[in-house]
Amino acid sequence: MEGNGREITVSGGFFERHADFDLKAVMAANSVQELIQAVTGTEYESLLKELESAAEKSYADYAFALDIYYYKKVWKEITKVSDKETRQILEQIFGTEIDWQNLMWMYRAKRFYSMGEADVKKHQIPVSCRLRSAETKRLLETETAEQFVEFVRQTAYFRGKQAVLEPEDELTWERVMIRTYEKICKKHPMSVAPVLRYLCLLYTSDAADE
């Protein structure tokens, strides 16, 4: 089971047009204080300041906080989409991505960091799509990475009519998302799904080239 190794590269254009802060200042920041200064007056300022005031924190904590904030905001915006088909497609796509971000984090925490259940839960995105609460609890309670993978293979992502992976498949974010897009695009060929699938393929292709 592997992470997606995401890395963001900014070269102007789209990001600079749509960001509500000085993107170059953010990319040039060499400390958390400089980063906070670069986003002063935006929705990110209070989030980063709150974390900065915590007694114990690391750069990873900031990354987790921003990820959680992003996914919570996306999920909230999806609920506002008026077209039912589009809303359901977005829920399936982003819900699957959130499930697997949480699964990958739990796996890494168990395999590489030997973290306790409370610390793992602290960094989880509080949204679930196809993972039931009982399954998440069971996964959190596993004692080894091997046991964790065994339990993941018993979830809806591997079993039932809506399964997107085969039992022998390697557990990776890329594989899950590509399979999910394939299923959705086959069912909804004239929807927003093919556009999102194209963007996903561009992203995974760029990540593979790095």
Predicted features and spans:
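Alpha-helix capping and inter-helical loop/turn segments
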Residues: 5-6, 114-115, 190
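Long acidic/polar interaction regions in large eukaryotic complex-forming proteins
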Residues: 5, 9-27, 144, 152-155
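Short, recurring structural edge motifs at helix starts
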Residues: 88-96, 193-202
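An N-terminal, globular interaction/scaffold subdomain
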Residues: 1-2
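Long amphipathic all-alpha helical oligomerization modules
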Residues: 181, 185, 189-198
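A contiguous, surface-oriented mixed alpha/beta subdomain in the mid-to-C-terminal portion of proteins
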Residues: 29-182
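Non-catalytic, well-ordered alpha-helical scaffold segments
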Residues: 100-104, 193, 205
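Conserved small/polar residues in nucleotide/adenosyl-binding loops
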Residues: 203-209
